[in-house]
Amino acid sequence: MEIIQELIAADAKRVVDPTLVLTADEWRKISDSSYTPQEEYILTYFLGEQPNGVKAILDKVQGVKIIAINNLFQDDYSEIGPGEFVDLIDHAKLILTDSFHASVFSMLLNSAFVVFDRHDDRYTTMNSRIENLLCTFQLEDRKYDEKIMERLYEKNYKKAYTILEKERASFMSFLNKTLKQ
């Protein structure tokens, strides 16, 4: 924000990502279950290299189907669209990710998730975006650490949803004010 203010000599306002403005029910209206299996599954979606710690979690949950989006070795899920993405997150037992949007949809759809740092030099700035999301919505406990196994399936997002309502109102106020100018 300070950088923007210095560059354009104007006040900058941080608002939530537009994906957070829609409700879970609104996102579910566009969901598409054509790729969603009937059995219980864990969803992995990594944009960078698969981080350390993923294997330990997957070893703990043996016997549960693993769906890996963005995995060259699992063709069934390599070309899903937004509707399938939303549905897979909505019905997963657990999501393991380094993706901002997978984290957003996990929170919105009340799905258990664990966020990992992205280990890819091209995407180092994305970690700060995810950190900001987790901090804003008081979900720092969803970040991978040595004690994550104790809270793997927790989905206590009550505080996050209260904050989200305020953030949505702020977004709409900003949008209305900006459009009137």
Each model region followed by its residue ranges:
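Active-site anion-handling motifs in enzyme catalytic cores
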Residues: 1-181
